[in-house]
Amino acid sequence: MAEEMRQELSALAAIFCGPHEWEMLSCSETDGAVFRIHTTAEGLAGEDVPLELAFHLPAGYPSCLPGISVNSERLTRAQCVTVKEKLLGEARRLLSEPMVHELVLWTQQNLRHILSQTETESSNGTCTLPESSTVDGGLWMTLLRLDHMRARTKYVKVVEKWASELRLTGRLMFMGKMILILLQGDRSNIKEYLILQKTSKVDVDSSGKKCKEKMISVLSETKVQTEHKRFLAFEVKEYSTLEELQKEFETAGLQELFSECVLGLVK
């Protein structure tokens, strides 16, 4: 991890030092840092709106954009997505310099305006495309591996909900003990999915207590190529044999992905 990122994390921990303001979730040399900041901003009626801002600073940060997730019990999912898109736009302006504190301040200062703008567009029946739709040059794809699902029914519903809200398509695939998630969509939305996956209590531990997903692996992340099939929906599928799973990948034009990332998991 770069010294610049270490210094920024240290400064953020000192700035957001109030009760429950700062929460470091993971930090490593290879994957960077994932953390949450709990703050408030002024809403439409002048009220304090609680905000949960989750950030993933990848190893290449600040030369590349952070992953950002926005959640609030007072905002709709659509409003949270809009705030995230605006934040990513601001992040692009600040690229190559430490930016997290600036982004938090910007959110606090601009939330009311963003919500007002969203409300106006909604009442006028207009629909604007997300700013991030062309940031990374089209559709991206990532393949994830989960170690286990103890609370499978609940876990599956949460994954389906996230995929729907973030406009991601693909597959949640079960074969024996193997669990894979293949996602296609806008890269910033895939990044937000990963933040949600790592920061939300989606499963239970051996004692039945709710817990966060700590055993998730990113097997591949790449742009969708012309030979790859575009998934039209997100589906949950179960396979009895390795051949069935392989056929799913081959049908989608992902033979190479299967050979490089999946085959070795069952040997």
Swiss-Prot record:
Residues 7-114 form the RWD domain. Residues 13-15, 100-102 are annotated as: Interaction with UBE2I/UBC9. Pfam families: RWD. This is RWD domain-containing protein 3. The RWD domain is required for the sumoylation enhancement activity. Its main location: nucleus. Keywords: Cytoplasm, Nucleus. GO terms for biological process: negative regulation of NF-kappaB transcription factor activity; positive regulation of hypoxia-inducible factor-1alpha signaling pathway; positive regulation of protein sumoylation. SUPFAM superfamilies: UBC-like. Interacts with UBE2I/UBC9, NFKBIA, HIF1A and NCOA2. PANTHER family: RWD DOMAIN-CONTAINING PROTEIN 3 (PTHR15628:SF1). It is found in: Nucleus; Cytoplasm. Enhancer of SUMO conjugation. Via its interaction with UBE2I/UBC9, increases SUMO conjugation to proteins by promoting the binding of E1 and E2 enzymes, thioester linkage between SUMO and UBE2I/UBC9 and transfer of SUMO to specific target proteins which include HIF1A, PIAS, NFKBIA, NR3C1 and TOP1. Positively regulates the NF-kappa-B signaling pathway by enhancing the sumoylation of NF-kappa-B inhibitor alpha (NFKBIA), promoting its stabilization which consequently leads to an increased inhibition of NF-kappa-B transcriptional activity. One of its GO terms (cellular component) is nucleus.
